[in-house]
């Protein structure tokens, strides 16, 4: 009888061990699966809608103009949306320099279908600024990222409006790229 009780106790311990380990394994597998799903569900995946690059430099003294977005002198970039109220992210970057008195600057404004994207700061978004001496460029690799909700499905276009401000006399924009993404 003593031996049977010992075997029963051993069998109960083995069953308990297997049950606990199975529960732990199932719990771990469930935690891993939920974590993976949470990571993929909460990731902010954007899809590339359009892009353009321009190699080389543009320089001038003009203001309030649309900058070339590629080497073919296109000042707009087309993209399309397939859902209403699409959240669009535009990233524009270029090497930038400006001449003028202290505190003068070059600004870029991102337009989608002629509407200013956010932050809608007009000519007050300083893309690059002048040096205090007014005769040397302060070269800057600058980036402007903007967001806008596009209400309609279909074809759209993005443009970059450039202004020189506060007495700036000359601007320079080097190699550039623009990327349009949709969330």
Indicate residue ranges for each PLM-predicted region:
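N-terminal secretory signal peptides that target proteins for export/translocation
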Residues: 1-23
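Extracellular jelly-roll beta-sandwich "head" domains, especially the C-terminal globular C1q domain
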Residues: 20, 41-183
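Bacterial N-terminal signal peptides
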Residues: 29-38
